[in-house]
């Protein structure tokens, strides 16, 4: 049996401000730092250890990973950074307040943009200063690989090649993985692992900073999954994610 640990980054400054973040590179709040440390403490208390860590190229995920590994005394672990683990790109919504956007367009439309499988938000213009196409961290990518907007379907299509080419082979060789990523890149992985339908994925919310453990068989099919720590607290935190965007 293999174990895979997925952690959504701790609270970011734009989580706190209830803003659409996407690929915007915002930092953790003090609460987010504590959530990341608590994730490490939970993992340490349960006896978890790792051989390699994976994260995105966005600082809220990389800092979450660092604080988690620091609590585990594993800051020396090899870390694989990939843009494919970035948060879903929210297009022209990036930087906007979720509640104000809901008041303008309606709760239903914002829910579709936030949680539906195949409907992306309005795209950024290519020359919009919020676009990441001139960001040095994406310099080796083609312009088409740096999105101007994404739906979850697009995020799945971006994440799965990385799972198939890097993460899954590492697990099959017996390496123990911890992944610090984002709500939607984790939703993409969970959708694939659990075979969740396009319709059902709308209701899945990933809480900040709580380790999600997958136990996998030799074919990397899930045997079970669970959050570490207080299950009721994890459920409450997921519900809080679901309520974002409401006035």
UniProtKB/Swiss-Prot annotation:
Stated role: Catalyzes the interconversion of 2-phosphoglycerate and 3-phosphoglycerate.
Transmembrane residue ranges: none
Pfam families: His_Phos_1 (PF00300)
SUPFAM superfamilies linked: Phosphoglycerate mutase-like (SSF53254)
Catalyzed chemical reaction(s): (2R)-2-phosphoglycerate = (2R)-3-phosphoglycerate
Positions bearing the site annotation: Transition state stabilizer: 182
Keyword vocabulary terms for this entry: Gluconeogenesis, Glycolysis, Isomerase
Name of the featured protein: 2,3-bisphosphoglycerate-dependent phosphoglycerate mutase
Gene Ontology biological-process annotations: gluconeogenesis; glycolytic process
CDD domains xrefs: HP_PGM_like
Quaternary structure annotation from Swiss-Prot or TrEMBL: Homodimer.
InterPro entries linked to this entry: His_Pase_superF_clade-1, His_PPase_superfam, PG/BPGM_mutase_AS, Phosphogly_mut1
Superkingdom in the source lineage: Bacteria
Originating species: Variovorax paradoxus (strain S110)
EC number(s) reported in the record: 5.4.2.11
GO molecular function: phosphoglycerate mutase activity
Name of the gene encoding the protein in the UniProt record: gpmA
């Amino acid at each position: 049996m293999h174990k895979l640990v997925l952690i959504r980054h701790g609270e970011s400054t734009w989580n706190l401000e209830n803003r659409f973040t996407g690929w915007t590179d915002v930092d953790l709040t003090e609460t987010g730092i504590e959530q990341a440390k608590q994730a490490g403490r939970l993992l340490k208390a349960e006896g978890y250890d790792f051989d390699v860590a994976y994260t995105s190229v966005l600082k809220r995920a990389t800092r979450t990973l660092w604080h988690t590994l620091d609590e585990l005394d594993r800051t020396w672990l090899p870390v694989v950074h990939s843009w494919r683990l970035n948060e879903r790109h929210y297009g022209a919504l990036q930087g906007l307040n979720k509640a104000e956007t809901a008041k303008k367009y309606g709760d239903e439309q914002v829910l579709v943009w936030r949680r539906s499988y195949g409907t992306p938000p309005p795209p950024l213009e290519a020359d919009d200063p919020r676009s990441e196409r001139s960001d040095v961290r994406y310099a080796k990518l083609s312009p088409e690989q740096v999105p101007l907007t994404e739906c979850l379907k697009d995020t799945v299509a971006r994440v799965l090649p990385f799972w198939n080419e890097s993460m899954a082979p590492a697990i099959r060789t017996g390496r123990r993985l911890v992944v610090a990523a984002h709500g939607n890149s984790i939703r993409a992985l969970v959708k694939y692992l659990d075979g969740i339908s396009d319709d059902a994925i709308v209701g899945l919310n990933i809480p900040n900073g709580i380790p999600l453990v997958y136990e996998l068989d030799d074919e990397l099919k899930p045997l079970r999954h669970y959050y570490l720590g207080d299950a009721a607290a994890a459920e409450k935190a997921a519900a809080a994610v679901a309520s974002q965007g409401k006035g």
